[in-house]
């Protein structure tokens, strides 16, 4: 079965309006300031991950939530996907230019079975699952989304990662012909993200191919994106074209851009504020005829998935390794 076939809200109304403007202003400033950027990556290595075992029951308990789903029209029209523009409504308008077939994902690095595969080859034989996850943006808003996809760990095992594979690095397509935002130096393209290997193998980590029972729309990261529900949304990289097993912590786009504001781990943590706004609360996207946001709610550690993932970070200083 092929994984491909395949809306307009008020723009730039995030958390407090100033938060949204601050994040855009940072991108504009850095685009004009070549001296800023890669500095800050030369940090001490984090402590090694503890030996943890996640039971099937623990994992399953995080696969669904009874919270009210965010409306499909909001999920598909209120997006961060800077390859298509920095306004929230830009991706739903501009991403229609993204060609989804053919789509190839290159897998390599510290593994015994590297290769370049079509999407169907990559996912062949792995049962698709529905997961209803909370999504928490670093900007202070959140959604509840029914995703369809496969466990990332099941895909990665096929490539037989070696003992040197301590991290997994991901890369988004960067094609200025299809992605107008790539023509501007708002980010050091291509967009890159990474996970520690145990995070990537965790049962909650999903390679998503759809939402609301349909293939992913282009603006939501089609045809293949990551969903890591206990981390801020920018870790859930979209439109993936490359996966690499690496020994050292990989460079990631937002950390590369501003390391003091966007850590590599970026676990949702209400006890660690962003330097320019609080992370203690969030505003759930709950669009109605009269308003886009519902009332503020308290943000939970690890976005409410602490029972499933907190053990991955036992002994780590989460304020240092934010």
Curated annotation (Swiss-Prot):
<comment type="similarity">
    <text>Belongs to the MsrP family.</text>
</comment>
<feature type="binding site">
    <location>
        <begin position="236"/>
        <end position="238"/>
    </location>
    <ligand>
        <name>Mo-molybdopterin</name>
    </ligand>
</feature>
<feature type="signal peptide" description="Tat-type signal">
    <location>
        <begin position="1"/>
        <end position="59"/>
    </location>
</feature>
<keyword id="KW-0479">Metal-binding</keyword>
<feature type="binding site">
    <location>
        <position position="220"/>
    </location>
    <ligand>
        <name>Mo-molybdopterin</name>
    </ligand>
</feature>
<feature type="binding site">
    <location>
        <position position="137"/>
    </location>
    <ligand>
        <name>Mo-molybdopterin</name>
    </ligand>
</feature>
<comment type="function">
    <text>Part of the MsrPQ system that repairs oxidized periplasmic proteins containing methionine sulfoxide residues (Met-O), using respiratory chain electrons. Thus protects these proteins from oxidative-stress damage caused by reactive species of oxygen and chlorine generated by the host defense mechanisms. MsrPQ is essential for the maintenance of envelope integrity under bleach stress, rescuing a wide series of structurally unrelated periplasmic proteins from methionine oxidation.</text>
</comment>
<keyword id="KW-0574">Periplasm</keyword>
<dbReference type="GO" id="GO:0016672">
    <property type="term" value="F:oxidoreductase activity, acting on a sulfur group of donors, quinone or similar compound as acceptor"/>
</dbReference>
<dbReference type="Pfam" id="PF00174">
    <property type="entry name" value="Oxidored_molyb"/>
</dbReference>
<feature type="binding site">
    <location>
        <position position="79"/>
    </location>
    <ligand>
        <name>Mo-molybdopterin</name>
    </ligand>
</feature>
<dbReference type="GO" id="GO:0042597">
    <property type="term" value="C:periplasmic space"/>
</dbReference>
<keyword id="KW-0560">Oxidoreductase</keyword>
<feature type="binding site">
    <location>
        <position position="225"/>
    </location>
    <ligand>
        <name>Mo-molybdopterin</name>
    </ligand>
</feature>
<dbReference type="GO" id="GO:0043546">
    <property type="term" value="F:molybdopterin cofactor binding"/>
</dbReference>
<protein>
    <recommendedName>
        <fullName>Protein-methionine-sulfoxide reductase catalytic subunit MsrP</fullName>
        <ecNumber>1.8.5.-</ecNumber>
    </recommendedName>
</protein>
<keyword id="KW-0500">Molybdenum</keyword>
<comment type="subunit">
    <text>Heterodimer of a catalytic subunit (MsrP) and a heme-binding subunit (MsrQ).</text>
</comment>
<dbReference type="InterPro" id="IPR022867">
    <property type="entry name" value="MsrP"/>
</dbReference>
<keyword id="KW-0732">Signal</keyword>
<dbReference type="InterPro" id="IPR000572">
    <property type="entry name" value="OxRdtase_Mopterin-bd_dom"/>
</dbReference>
<feature type="binding site">
    <location>
        <position position="172"/>
    </location>
    <ligand>
        <name>Mo-molybdopterin</name>
    </ligand>
</feature>
<feature type="binding site">
    <location>
        <begin position="82"/>
        <end position="83"/>
    </location>
    <ligand>
        <name>Mo-molybdopterin</name>
    </ligand>
</feature>
<dbReference type="GO" id="GO:0046872">
    <property type="term" value="F:metal ion binding"/>
</dbReference>
<dbReference type="InterPro" id="IPR036374">
    <property type="entry name" value="OxRdtase_Mopterin-bd_sf"/>
</dbReference>
<dbReference type="GO" id="GO:0030091">
    <property type="term" value="P:protein repair"/>
</dbReference>
